[in-house]
Amino acid sequence: MRMQRRHLLKNAAAALAALGLPALPQWALAAKAVGLRRLGQPQPFDYAWLKGRARELAKAPYKSHKQVLPGPLEALNWDQYQSIRYRQDHALWADGNGKFQAKFFHLGLYFHTPVHIYDIVDGKAQQLAYDPAAFDYGKSGLGGKQLPKDLGFAGFRLNTRKDTERDFSAFLGASYFRAVGKEGQYGQSARGLAIDTGTGGPEEFPDFIAYYLEQPAADSNTVVVYGLLDSPSIAGAYRFAITNGDVLLMDIDSALYPRKTIERLGIGPCTSMYQVGENDNRMDWDWRPEIHDTDGLAMWTGGGEWIWRPLCNPPHVRFNMFVDENPRGFGLLQRDRNFDHYQDDGVFYEKRPCLWVEPKSGWGKGSVQLVEIPTVDETFDNIVAFWNPQAKPQPGQELLMGYRLYWGVQPPASAPLAHCVATRTGLGGIVGQKRSHFSWRFAVDFAGGELAALAKDPKAKVEAVLQVSRGTTEIVSARPLHELKGYRAMFDLVPPDEGTQQIDIRLYLRANGKPLTETWLYQWTPLAASERKN
């Protein structure tokens, strides 16, 4: 399904019959679990079967999954939709003795794509039936009698048996899913795939059209979920092994089958929001100092370099490509954990999880790609990062991609070097002296590694290694910042002309020829000539 990003959820829809799977009938068999109804008989299931199903799906022409929902569901507003809750006594596995339960999301509002959901027990899958009696319709104005018996579900969420109200992972809308770590606060999302993101044309949003939930053993800490994905360009089979914990781990295997050549395929896409922060206050009219789910893109390259790229809310769509081979990991991180920097006691941005992508095997040549989209609205996800293979996927291929996703306060891997803790920018020049020309100041703070010891050593010779793609730099320095037990690098950048062409910046600290910090990358758009101050 191709569409403008801002209209994704409002236009995402699917018809059950389009896949060729059996539609839900008006009758259903009695449930074995409390309150649940099932359809047909259990059928043998494993990941190999699901890959075969995706392969056959890709051989056939794509059929639209668009389906019009009943009028009352189409008319729901946000508050009405939020009031619809799945009943606890109907939760999947509620009658068992395992650690986990699953509950289902109702269709409506933005969520127009019915998905088949199956329960896997002892290697056999059986479809779960939509049942209006399983939902409390709250203040929605709906009742089960108004809705068809074959409506279907929008997605699902996972809970622990000890905490049935707070979910630790949810799959809802297109191929979106998300999870939380020990902070229990949702933030950024992941996707099954990103297709043609940031190309300038319509983006394609694949849909998970079926989920298969495997009943965990009683003593298991892991829930295994399978997903069948479909879109005009590709079909795919996914296996998620989800282990709940302080850092939630998703071990993912995917098998992808293109229908046609894909211009830009995004593997392991992370989707986030950045409106305003310390380094970019272009949209600083809000009363809160900072508004973002994440504040930077971290990368651990195949060559071993650690890179930090602060995020921005640019004046126009910005696309960056970081060429690599066999990357060791990348992700969108929320490094700033200070409540005082956000002052939001409703959504708690300081608790939002980082998301780290770790390939399980060599991914070959390609690039980590970053798309930043202008936004004035914190409800609009305007940041996307993903891996793009150098070779464009071709019809008839099988692409096997395995990776792990880590959701939590910190990623599982971090540089042995010092890391960037803050980036600030503003008007350059020397205080008390008349400016003869326009310049822009950058102050980059580093902490960790050897910096605490070096900051105490008066003989230490720490220098800033700085490169810019255009313009000139001046007033370059690196000095101890005792409050952070680290160092602050500072410099002014003078644009070469009055234009607004972007300037790429690269910076790290070193001593005695040895790097002390990760590499800080930045892309700055100079102010228009009419906005510059001397």
Curated annotation (Swiss-Prot):
Q: Which Pfam families match?
A: MdoG
Lineage, top-rank taxon, reads: Bacteria
Q: Which residues form the signal peptide?
A: 1-30
Q: Does the keyword Signal apply?
A: yes
Q: Which Gene3D superfamilies match?
A: 2.70.98.10, Immunoglobulins
**One annotated GO molecular function:** catalytic activity
User: Which pathway is this protein assigned to?
Assistant: Glycan metabolism; osmoregulated periplasmic glucan (OPG) biosynthesis
User: Would I find Nucleotide-binding among this entry's keywords?
Assistant: no
Q: How is the polypeptide modified once translated?
A: Predicted to be exported by the Tat system. The position of the signal peptide cleavage has not been experimentally proven.
- Spell out the family assignment given in the record's similarity comment: Belongs to the OpgD/OpgG family.
**What is this protein for, i.e. what is its function?**
Probably involved in the control of the structural glucose backbone of osmoregulated periplasmic glucans (OPGs).
Query: What name has this protein been given in UniProt?
Result: Glucans biosynthesis protein D
- Organism of derivation: Xanthomonas oryzae pv. oryzae (strain KACC10331 / KXO85)
